[in-house]
Amino acid sequence: MKVATSALLIGAAAAQQQQILKFPDSFSELKESSWTKPLQNLEESLKSLTGEARATWDEIAMMFPESFEKAAFFSEPKPHTRKQDSEWDHIIKGADIQSVWVENEKGEKEREIDGKLEQYSLRAKKVDPSVLGVDKVKQYSGYLDDEEEDKHLFYWFFESRNDPKNDPVVLWLNGGPGCSSLTGLFMELGPASITKDQKIKHNPYSWNSNASVIFLDQPVNVGYSYSSGSVSNTVAAGKDIYALLTLFFKQFPEYSHQSFHISGESYAGHYIPVFASEILSHKNRNINLQSVLIGNGLTDGLTQYEYYRPMACGEGGWPAVLDESQCKAMDNAYPRCASLIENCYNSESVWSCVPASIYCNNAMIGPYQRTGQNVYDVRKPCGSNSLCYDELDWIQGYLNKKEVMKAVGAEVSNYESCNFDINRNFLLQGDWMKPFHRVVPGILEKIPVLIYAGDADYICNWLGNKAWTEALEWPGAKAYNQAKMEDFKIDGDGKTVGQVKSSGNFTFMRLHAGGHMVPYDQPEASLEMLNRWLGGGFWKA
């Protein structure tokens, strides 16, 4: 059964042929509610639309009329019931942090911690490990609250199974945009998975084996998170992440001195560069950011989209999915795709970036998707679930149990693994195709960056990820490009599980027989990668 045309691709790149926009007849009826803010932004953009941009928009609309007709401009807020403050074990307010001033080396007064935090607060509760049985370690869950914008981000923290007083802390982000990081928790790298009958199954390769891990549902209205408004671009989400981490480490200072790392997959290839840059921009911070890890990410569309045809046509190490005529059609379509992406890169305008996303996803992802083959794993068909994995239904069922929601303090009325409307809102803002790779050189000046990719993924394939790291302009580019791919082996048994190249602060890793979600397909290899990376095994040389 082929992927549903309305499918949102897990963790990141959604094939957008169904999520295209048309002009509304009237904005006036829709602008009463704050959650229609993307519409207001669109109306403002209309005022500055050039004739050339409008012509491009209309051209793409004519090519894919059905897609435009199925457009959705907004998402409704999630039903929720906020708990009394007395039901939480800890509450910390950003205003209290902002009120602390210190004297710097020059004798000048400055805030102890930078950033605009007054509007934020953090609620936390201890999760009794014996109630759910997900893991035996210390756990906290709760919400970051933005009281001004009425945004509430849910998180779930698991302490390291090994040495939590000294082990690193890792933030994990799924992509979408619009997919819950709790799917990563229970399907990929968390302490347990969910079985078909919604039972807990211990994961011996959990990433909290040697690190404490925070799973965050973001942006708002994803998973257990909620809001009466909306976040529809990556940069806006970055401010929330900085606030969350600042308040979390202030409330739990026992974790603030260890090294901190941001990790994620797919659309996190957009998120992580921006989030890391936001954190590093603050001189006075309590976030000890030491590295970032991006798995099968979408970061540089101009480079990565060129490699859809090779991956689909047997040049990525796996048999071809498409026939010769389909491959030729993709070859013919790419120059137009590249031209549209270049226009997006040059202007970063919604009117350039949205058509680029629409055309390129239809031309470069659509032919593969229509075969019914799994876009996350070229080795297998998609199956009956519209997102190709039955586990997502099992996880959704488990996280909708009343006893589970009560145990973690969830305030929404229902949990969904992925919110399709969030995906469309990000597309509406032109976020999909923007050049977030341009942020990476500034990050490389300060901390190491790992780009890893399972080599059986199609949607954010290893060919494209390797290519964009080699196309990136940064001071260490020459040495990085001259570095050779070497075998990556499991310590102890010497089994080769991938290849890696590294120079300076930049590392790329190809993991054999892993799909879009490497920890799901290759749990042992993914944990080996994480442990080696956190230990500095790739960049110290």
From Swiss-Prot:
Gene Ontology terms: biological process: proteolysis
Pfam families: Carbpep_Y_N, Peptidase_S10
Signal peptide limits: 1-17
InterPro entries per UniProt: AB_hydrolase_fold, Peptidase_S10, Propeptide_carboxypepY, Ser_caboxypep_ser_AS
Single GO MF annotation: serine-type carboxypeptidase activity
Keywords assigned by UniProt, alphabetized: Carboxypeptidase, Disulfide bond, Glycoprotein, Hydrolase, Protease, Signal, Vacuole, Zymogen
Gene3D superfamilies: 1.10.287.410, alpha/beta hydrolase
EC top class named in words: hydrolase
Propeptide: 18-125
Top-level taxon of origin: Eukaryota
GO cellular component labels: fungal-type vacuole
Sugar-bearing residue positions: N210, N505
Active site: S266, D457, H516
Annotated localization: Vacuole
Catalysis: reaction(s): Release of a C-terminal amino acid with broad specificity
Main location: other
Protein family: Belongs to the peptidase S10 family.
Summary of the function given for this chain in its UniProt record: Vacuolar carboxypeptidase involved in degradation of small peptides. Digests preferentially peptides containing an aliphatic or hydrophobic residue in P1' position, as well as methionine, leucine or phenylalanine in P1 position of ester substrate.
Protein name: Carboxypeptidase Y homolog A
Organism whose genome encodes this protein: Pyrenophora tritici-repentis (strain Pt-1C-BFP)
